C-alpha cells in the first residue's frame, strides 16, 4: 500500500537533492534572489524560512551562549559558506527582526521555451537594492586586495635575501 510521501523528491536521490537545496539556499542568501523552476523554489523556500527563523533566535540578548552556538551550527549544516552565514546572522536576521514569517516570496515568470517548465524567482521580501549590493561587493573586494598586498609586502620584507654562490668546475 502506498503511503503519502512528505518529501518532494525533485527527481533526484537524497544526496543530490540535499546538495541542490543547500546550494540554492546559499545562493539565495548571498544574492538575495534566485531564479529556478517552481517546484525547486517551493522546496527551497520552506528550508530558507526555517533558517531565517533560526538566525532570528540569536538576536535575543539573554540567550545562553550554548544556544547561540547551537543555532549557528544548525544553520551551518545547510550553508557551507562562512561569509553567507555571517551575512544571515548579522544582516538578514536584523532586517526581519519584527516580522513573523513571510521572509521570502515566489514570483512566477513565463514558462521556459525549451521544455515549457514553470519558472519563477525566489527573493527575500526586504531585499537590498542592486546598487547597494554592488557597492558592498566592491568595498569588500578592495579590502581583500589591500589585505593581500599587505601580506605580500610582509612576506617580502621577512624573507632574507638569497646570495648567489658561484660554483667552480673541477678540472
UniProtKB/Swiss-Prot annotation:
Residues 140-171 are annotated as: Disordered. The keyword Ribosomal protein applies. The keyword Ribonucleoprotein applies. GO terms for cellular component: cytosolic large ribosomal subunit. It comes from the Bacteria. Residues 140-152 have a biased composition (Basic and acidic residues). It holds the Pfam family Ribosomal_L17. One of its GO terms (biological process) is translation. GO terms for molecular function: structural constituent of ribosome. Disulfide bonds: none annotated. Residues 156-165 have a biased composition (Polar residues). Keywords: Ribonucleoprotein, Ribosomal protein. PROSITE patterns: RIBOSOMAL_L17 (PS01167). Part of the 50S ribosomal subunit. Contacts protein L32. Belongs to the bacterial ribosomal protein bL17 family. This is Large ribosomal subunit protein bL17. The lineage of its organism: Bacteria, Pseudomonadati, Spirochaetota, Spirochaetia, Leptospirales.
Amino acid at each position: 500500500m502506498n503511503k503519502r510521501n512528505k518529501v518532494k523528491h525533485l527527481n533526484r536521490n537524497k544526496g543530490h537533492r540535499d546538495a541542490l537545496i543547500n546550494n540554492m539556499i546559499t545562493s539565495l542568501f548571498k544574492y538575495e534572489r534566485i531564479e529556478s523552476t517552481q517546484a525547486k523554489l517551493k522546496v527551497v523556500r520552506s528550508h530558507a524560512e526555517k533558517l531565517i527563523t533560526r538566525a532570528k533566535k540569536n538576536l535575543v540578548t539573554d540567550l545562553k551562549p550554548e544556544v547561540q552556538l547551537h543555532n549557528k551550527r544548525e544553520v551551518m549544516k545547510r550553508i557551507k559558506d562562512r561569509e553567507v552565514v555571517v551575512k544571515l546572522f548579522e544582516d538578514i536576521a536584523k532586517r526581519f527582526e519584527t516580522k513573523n514569517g513571510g521572509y521570502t516570496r515566489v514570483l512566477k515568470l513565463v514558462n521556459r521555451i525549451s521544455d515549457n517548465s514553470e519558472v519563477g524567482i525566489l527573493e527575500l521580501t526586504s531585499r537590498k537594492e542592486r546598487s547597494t549590493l554592488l557597492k558592498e561587493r566592491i568595498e569588500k573586494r578592495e579590502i581583500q586586495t589591500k589585505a593581500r598586498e599587505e601580506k605580500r609586502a610582509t612576506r617580502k620584507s621577512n624573507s632574507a635575501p638569497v646570495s648567489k654562490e658561484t660554483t667552480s668546475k673541477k678540472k
